[in-house]
Amino acid sequence: MFMNKKVMIGMSGGVDSSVAAYLLKQQGYDVIGVTMKLWQDDDVVEIEGGCCSLSAVEDARRVANKIGIPFYVLNFREVFKEKVIDYFIDEYLEGKTPNPCIACNKHIKFDDFYKKARQIGCDYVATGHYAKIEKDESTGRYLLKKSVTDKKDQTYALYNLTQEQLEHTLLPIGDYEKDRVREIAKEMGMAVHNKPDSQEICFVKDNDYANYVKKHSKKRIEEGFFVDTKGNILGKHKGILYYTIGQRKGLGITFGKPMFVIDINPINNTIVLGDNEDLFKKELIAKDVNFISIDTLEEPLRVQAKIRYSAKPSPATIHRVGEDTIKIVFDEAQRAITKGQSVVMYDGDIVVGGGIIEKSL
């Protein structure tokens, strides 16, 4: 039992963080439940599963009352707008496809939220993420490891965690299957036991990110041209933010064969279209790299790397090319390597590290 160890847990009102809070209480921790009030416009307050809608706050409050822990709502709207929403908008305007959940974990949940917890004397922060943290006694390093089920594993979104953060973070449901988590919630009489998983970007209604960016951007969205790989004009596009690498449907123009978005050039406002085989590349450059299982990359290292949340890790070799920049060379070409997405590297179930894809080669 961990009597007198104080932990502040982020509660979204969903089943995962609710059960995580319950498990911590059962283990003897002094648990404080907190819902983070993030930025949301009036028209998206009640997104189904939205993590800071009024209903989500009330769900979290009811769970906290049921398991007998204090509950608070903390306002992170300003920093969330600056570090997540503005970043999200800027990246799309640059022809990239960002992952706002990774930015939120890096800047909000495991930075500002973490600092707030430490300021009030908490020993740990906790979340309902599906991942595990272990200490390697031989090296003294804290390791981030995949959860027991690959289907729900969320290590991809947590690669920015530092050694200090890992030391003071608890992930109570990393050893549980999702079905078991729901069972525990039902056994405890939690109304959230059958609450649907959130599937959308929490601040974007109906997942319509393009119109969200258009509405909130100070920059005018300009039409431009589709071009082929040789630069020949094929037609007009309605603005680069409406397209992503690998896209085939919704181009608004028809050809005699399937055509795919293979590159987006914000400088001259063009979108390059090509064949499916043009999407396959073996190399990429990643920046803002954070390593977890190693301190620095001294020499080429064999890993398994995944280029998006839903991808399977693929064998590759990583090479250092700068202070926080690496080149990844895959054994087999990867389809639709996308600027702005994260690439995360693994050694089996251990997270080696990750970074933001700058370009494919």
Swiss-Prot record:
Keyword RNA-binding assigned: yes
GO molecular function list: ATP binding; tRNA binding; tRNA-uridine 2-sulfurtransferase activity
Active-site residues, as the UniProt record annotates them: C104 (nucleophile), C202 (cysteine persulfide intermediate)
A biological process term (GO) from this entry: tRNA wobble position uridine thiolation
Residues at which ATP binds: G10, M11, S12, G13, G14, V15, D16, S17, M36, G128
Site positions for Interaction with tRNA: H129, Q341
Record-linked InterPro entries: MnmA-like, MnmA-like_C, MnmA-like_central, MnmA-like_central_sf, Rossmann-like_a/b/a_fold
Locations listed in the record: Cytoplasm
Region named Interaction with tRNA: 152-154, 308-309
Disulfide links within the chain: C104-C202
GO cellular component: cytoplasm
Pfam families from the UniProt entry: tRNA_Me_trans, tRNA_Me_trans_C, tRNA_Me_trans_M
Catalyzed reactions per annotation: S-sulfanyl-L-cysteinyl-[protein] + uridine(34) in tRNA + AH2 + ATP = 2-thiouridine(34) in tRNA + L-cysteinyl-[protein] + A + AMP + diphosphate + H(+)
EC class (word): transferase
Keywords attached to this entry: ATP-binding, Cytoplasm, Disulfide bond, Nucleotide-binding, RNA-binding, Transferase, tRNA processing, tRNA-binding
Coiled-coil annotated spans: none
Entry's EC annotation: 2.8.1.13
Family (UniProt): Belongs to the MnmA/TRMU family.
Task of the protein: Catalyzes the 2-thiolation of uridine at the wobble position (U34) of tRNA, leading to the formation of s(2)U34.
Name of the protein described by the UniProt record: tRNA-specific 2-thiouridylase MnmA
Species for this entry: Clostridioides difficile (strain 630) (Peptoclostridium difficile)
Gene: mnmA
